[in-house]
Amino acid sequence: MALRGVYAQLLNRGPGLRVFRSWSSATAQTEKGEKTQSRSAKPSRPEFDWRDPLLLEEQLTADEILIRDTFRTYCQERLMPRILLANRNEVFHREIISEMGELGMLGPTIQGYSCAGVSSVAYGLLARELERVDSGYRSAMSVQSSLVMYPIYAYGSEEQKQKYLPRLAKGELLGCFGLTEPNHGSDPSGMETRARHNPSSRSYILSGSKTWITNSPVADLLIVWARCEDSCIRGFLLEKGMRGLSTPRIEGKFSLRASSTGMIIMDDVEVPEENVLPGVSGLAGPFGCLNNARYGITWGVLGAAEFCLHTARQYTLDRIQFGVPLAKNQLIQKKLADMLTEITLGLHACLQLGRLKDQDKAAPEMVSLLKRNNCGKALDIARQARDMLGGNGISDEYHVIRHVMNLESVNTYEGTHDIHALILGRAITGIQAFVAGK
């Protein structure tokens, strides 16, 4: 379904959304009128809006703004009310995937197969709005779009695309991506999961385990990477219910609690030959998927950082100590200025990367640069905001501590902060330093 059409439908669903539309229009008209009066009263002078310091809005297309505003409304009105208890109780709401599917937000950059076919920037804007609410929700969407739908689209057969992509796009199926193993995180080349070919049954027998897999306990479709007898790594499509396949949940997380995380355990799981992804072999396959997912993360974490900035700003304006607002303190203003600076620079870098991505000019190192920078800066901002809220900063009702906990994970997964430093170091020097002495 076209996202423009979805936007029109969403706005017509209820009075609350019509109020949002009216408020947005009225606000825009009021601001326009104020600016007009200001220009007539004195010579024209560029105005600074701290909410959009370098005019990101002016660099987006009308469609991108429309898509973002649609999803922002959904996130704030449908997801934000759920997240407090979901995080407290460590509950993943499966229905949000179906809801996002109805909005056309799953696999949105894919052309055809019931997908929206929007720009990479539009996808980034979606990730930003989703992670403004919670990193766990963004993780679920990111896995579905970049780690499940993308490899089927990029490496799958036409039969696989027709069979799975439309149902994944609608949220009827939920997928997961199995690469990380108990003994192999940053070094997937040491993969121990094995796939033995059985010519007589035209199938592969998979044995091994994967861990820290987002969505695995509730997944209908599992993309698993395994080493074949020729030592080549290939991707396999496993379906829920296959004999020998289990996906136990990992309990007791203090991060991404609104996301379902688990293992994939394969005890001689028989997978038909037609379930092998034919278009890729070797680590280029999973790395290509991760590159797409990391791009979404670069946008998403800034949404979380923006939430923390806005919360800290309002709190320090409202909180009176020693007879004045905390925001009157020079140290507080410096912290807010530092936060705003890093978020602004990060967003404009994301915009440039998105445009390059749509032109097929985005090198993996570019993504590593922003994944490393934006995740690290977002975590720093969340920690600062937590501190600025004082004792209230550890209360989940203010949401900032939840973002701190979540960003600790996001700074680690899909390439740790240090691994991305080594990727960039190799690009700078021409020398790989992943293993000392090699």
Curated annotation (Swiss-Prot):
Residues at which substrate binds: R138, S139, S186, F287, G288, C289, L290, N291, N292, A293, R294, G415
Transmembrane parts of this sequence: none
Family membership: Belongs to the acyl-CoA dehydrogenase family.
Annotated PROSITE patterns: ACYL_COA_DH_2
EC number: 1.3.8.6
Positions carrying N6-acetyllysine: K240
Record localization: Mitochondrion matrix
Co-factor requirement: FAD
Protein name, entry field: Glutaryl-CoA dehydrogenase, mitochondrial
Recorded GO CC terms: mitochondrial matrix
Active site: E414 (proton acceptor)
Swiss-Prot/TrEMBL keywords: Acetylation, FAD, Flavoprotein, Mitochondrion, Oxidoreductase, Transit peptide
Record: residues binding FAD: 177-186, 212-214, 319, 330, 387-391, 416-418, 434
Organism: Bos taurus
Known role: Catalyzes the oxidative decarboxylation of glutaryl-CoA to crotonyl-CoA and CO(2) in the degradative pathway of L-lysine, L-hydroxylysine, and L-tryptophan metabolism. It uses electron transfer flavoprotein as its electron acceptor.
The protein's annotated pathway: Amino-acid metabolism; lysine degradation; Amino-acid metabolism; tryptophan metabolism
Self-association state and partner proteins as the record states: Homotetramer.
